[in-house]
Amino acid sequence: MRTVFVDCRWELGAPARGRELYLEAHIPGAAFLDVEADLSDLSVENAGRHPLPTADRFAAAAGRAGIGAGTLVVAYGSLGGAERLWWLLRHFGHDDCGVLLGGLAAWGGALRGGEETIEPAEFVPHARTDDTIEAGEIDRRLSDRTLLLVDARTPNRWRGEENPIDDPPGRIPGARNAPWADPLPELPEGELVAYCGSGVTACVPLHRAWLEGRDGRLYPGSWSEWSQRGLPLERG
């Protein structure tokens, strides 16, 4: 099996920064996939800030990165970019993938700058239907004690304090806080659902739970969709 490294670094509010960092230094041979251009479809309206890409869109991006049958993908990044790629790969049927925990800083080998010549591959998507949840189902099940909602945003955003990202601020009623940058807290039993601001950092607690043998679902639209639909919210 061939190993493919993929750099998924990005910065919220600075779309070009991820590629700039990649060009400065990356794991030799690594491809680059952009969270907003490749791992999202920003043309989709009313679905949050980072809607999921279609199967065809993701397949094209994955193929450009050299991902296909017989490849083991190792993703690294920042702000949940690597976990977003991990989640999308599994969502579209490619389970041979992992995340370099600690990101590029954990890589002990040489680095290289500039562009890479990546041999393209054919990525054939086979989308799962059991790993996402939509706002309507969550709304209907807010009083369902078997649904375990986890909010991956920072504590101040989870509490609903004023901040420059969430408008309006708040959280989905009943959601527990599991900040993406912290270790996964101990969670009770239940049907795990993760969300964040836009469906990127929510993939971090899902990945950590998976490492512990627990599957969960992603709410792709997350708070940036929920908050615009007039649905219930909590603060404090």
Place the predicted regions along the sequence by residue.
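Cytosolic catalytic domains that perform sulfur/thiol-centered chemistry
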Residues: 1-236
